[in-house]
């Protein structure tokens, strides 16, 4: 369940409805049979190459940090540049013999100038069916230091049938999509939602789409009601075109609304009133620069995707300076991550006849050599 810091429900009357908040791995606007619903896979066991005429997106693990994509022949797959882990095919010929890869830039100038950093995608298609494993990791260079921040992210897949569009807000959320029937545009956010010109991603049409968000991803089905969502946690919402955004979203400063009553109590004291006004000016200036404690009021009915905005980060230093002090400080205050074990990064993948049959963690590769020797 999400904490109150993530979302708050505004009840306009006495009637209270139990809000549905579930962890999301796949979201579809079509009703399917249970046997057709995409399932969350715990490992890469029994993943076969897709022989059907439609692509299949399946998330792997918990959290879902890997996406398995099955693509039929001559069907284009678009993935964020540098996120492909592996490619394989069941065909007797190598997937490299028929694979075509092209770089595609999506609105590079507009995205760079107005807040969407990720505009480089790789278009991949082949004359034979193939599988691709896609990573959710995104490396970000930290300005002013010699480090890179690698944030923990997870996948959610969307199946668009043309009836609903999706508005996606984080700058690096669109990780992969399949087909040429999806339209991706970058309209400007309404002035009521941002102080500076910024764009978001609007996806419409038919096809499969995979988003990534920090931490876990949850789905909220909103009825004819209103909900407050912390800005950093809002991943995407379902909409009917770009024109619906101004009526569906509104900026809310939660601290300002909660403290209105306390201001009335000190208004009769001139000295306290002066210090209160000075504090408000400083606080408002700080929030103007940092966007702290800003919420978005979302009006239903619609579907929302929220990310828990995990703060678990690992720092990779280029020259090692400062790393010793950082880890000693983290350990002393009790926030250090547990010591990594060999099985956390040693993996054995078994491939038979072009299919991935097994995926295991090992403490040592010597164990695998002994098993093969026997």
UniProtKB/Swiss-Prot annotation:
It comes from the Eukaryota. Its main location: mitochondrion. Keywords: Mitochondrion, Transit peptide. InterPro entries: AIM24, AIM24_sf. GO terms for biological process: inner mitochondrial membrane organization. It is found in: Mitochondrion. Pfam families: AIM24 (PF01987). One of its GO terms (cellular component) is mitochondrial inner membrane. The keyword NAD does not apply. Residues 1-18 form a transit peptide. PANTHER family: ALTERED INHERITANCE OF MITOCHONDRIA PROTEIN 24, MITOCHONDRIAL (PTHR36959:SF2). Belongs to the AIM24 family. This is Altered inheritance of mitochondria protein 24, mitochondrial.
């Amino acid at each position: 369940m999400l904490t109150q810091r993530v979302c708050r429900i505004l009840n306009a009357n006495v009637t209270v409805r139990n809000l549905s908040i579930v962890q999301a791995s796949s979201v579809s606007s079509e009703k399917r049979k249970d046997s057709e619903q995409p399932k969350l896979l715990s490992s890469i066991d029994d993943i076969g190459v897709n022989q059907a005429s439609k692509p299949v997106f399946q998330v792997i693990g918990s959290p879902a940090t890997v996406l398995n994509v099955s693509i039929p022949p001559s069907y284009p797959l678009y993935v964020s540049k540098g996120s492909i882990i592996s490619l394989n095919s069941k065909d007797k010929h190598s997937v490299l013999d028929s694979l075509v890869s092209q770089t595609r830039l999506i609105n590079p100038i507009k995205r760079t100038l107005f807040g969407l950093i990720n505009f480089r995608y790789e278009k991949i298609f082949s004359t034979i069916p193939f599988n691709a494993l896609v990573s959710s990791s995104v490396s970000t260079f930290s300005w002013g230091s010699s480090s890179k921040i690698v944030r923990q992210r997870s996948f959610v897949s969307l199946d668009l049938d043309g009836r609903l569009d999706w508005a996606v807000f984080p700058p690096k959320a669109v990780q992969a999509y399949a087909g040429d029937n999806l339209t991706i545009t970058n309209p400007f956010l309404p002035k009521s939602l941002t102080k500076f010109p910024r764009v978001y991603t609007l996806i419409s049409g038919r096809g499969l789409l995979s988003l990534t968000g920090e931490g876990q991803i949850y789905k909220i089905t909103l009825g004819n009601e209103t909900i407050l969502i912390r800005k950093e946690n809002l991943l995407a919402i379902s909409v009917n075109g770009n024109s619906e955004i101004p009526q569906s979203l509104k900026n809310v400063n939660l601290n300002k609304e909660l403290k209105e009553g306390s201001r009335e109590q000190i208004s009769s004291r001139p000295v306290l009133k002066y210090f209160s006004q000075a504090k408000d000016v400083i606080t408002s200036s700080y929030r103007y620069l940092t966007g702290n404690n800003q919420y978005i009021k979302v009006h239903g009915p619609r579907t929302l995707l929220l990310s828990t905005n995990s703060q678990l980060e690992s720092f990779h230093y280029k020259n090692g300076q400062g790393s010793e002090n950082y880890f000693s400080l983290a350990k002393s205050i009790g926030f250090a991550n547990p010591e990594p074990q060999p099985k956390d990064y040693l993996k054995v993948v078994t491939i038979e006849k072009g299919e991935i049959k097994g995926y295991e963690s090992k403490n040592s590769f010597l164990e695998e050599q002994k098993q093969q020797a026997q």
